Amino acid sequence: MTKPDKSSQPSIAKGNPSTAGNTRVFVDGSTRSYAALRTAAIGFGTYKPGWRWSLHARSQMGKDSENHIGYIISGHMMVKDPSGNEAEIEPGCAFEIAPGSDAWVIGDEPCIALDFIPIRDHSVSQ
């Protein structure tokens, strides 16, 4: 995705990730969509029980995971950093995950999460 020309944009930007036409469907049927605003993109992910970055996203994305900043709306996610440290992220938690980490849904309900990407770092492949 190219950087938007901010000089021609209004001072207020809005978008709906579910209608922005930027949705990725992972091999297990989980989805992640985003809306690009002026300086950041807001992602909305619905990850099914059993979804795991290393199994359902890495090969499709063609790269290791990148830094992620987000917020869990519902469901639970377990994250393992490159050093082997693990943390459960539950509803209501904001998080920042280091590049090279793995993450997976735990429990029987989907994990619904927002993520926030500065436009300078955002690419379509995310």
Regions found by a protein language model. Give the residues of each.
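Short acidic-glycine-tyrosine-enriched beta hairpin
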Residues: 82-100
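Ligand-binding loop in jelly-roll beta-barrel domains
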Residues: 98-124
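A short, N-terminal "cap"/entry segment at the start of jelly-roll beta-barrel domains
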Residues: 1-46, 54, 59-60
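Short, conserved beta-strand element in jelly-roll/cupin
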Residues: 62-79
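Detector for glycine-centered tight turns/loop "hinges" at secondary-structure junctions
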Residues: 29, 50, 84-86
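Short beta-strand segments in beta-sandwich/barrel cores
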Residues: 52-53, 75-80, 103
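Short beta-strand segments
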Residues: 43, 85-87, 112
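Conserved GNAT-family N-acetyltransferase fold
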Residues: 45-47, 70, 95
